[in-house]
Amino acid sequence: CRKVQKGQRMFNQSPAFQILRGGLAESAATSKKEFISAYITDTRLMGVVGLVLHWYLPENLTKDHFFQFFYMDAEEYGFDTYRSVLTAGTGEDALEAVDELRSVENSLIGCLGGKKTPLTEREARAVVQQYVDFNLRLKLPLPEGIEEYQFLLGPHITLDSDEALALMKKQSPVFTSEFQVIHYFLMR
């Protein structure tokens, strides 16, 4: 170590330091997100829908895939349940995450039965915003984890009538027989 005299400046002559991010720093809430896919169940006529969004997190080094699961009740409870899974896209961690993804999906959406209909990012954001608005209007609490889904709440999406109808059709099954119609009304 060299002794520095008063008034003299000491310059660091060692190589530049590099900051390495650890895996614990990876977070879905603060990471940049790129939309991969989304789907909604066609169970709206039952009064509830399940929504799943899949994001790629390009800035994360290991856990670079983020899945969001929403359970929404259109009649009474609004946006009722939120769960998420942050996982690696490849390797052994990804295989382990498959079980967790299936478990979360089955617990929230599997019981609904309906078909899974693909959505665009715009449609998925609109659905989340509609149910958050529902909760706020009825003074219902939002599910925990808002720091992970609040990015979906802005900017506000306004669907025109054609877009709104197309989105409603994606959430509702097509009746192909009179028996299905009768069954629907009996179950309601």
Each predicted region: which residue ranges?
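Non-catalytic terminal/accessory regions
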Residues: 4-188
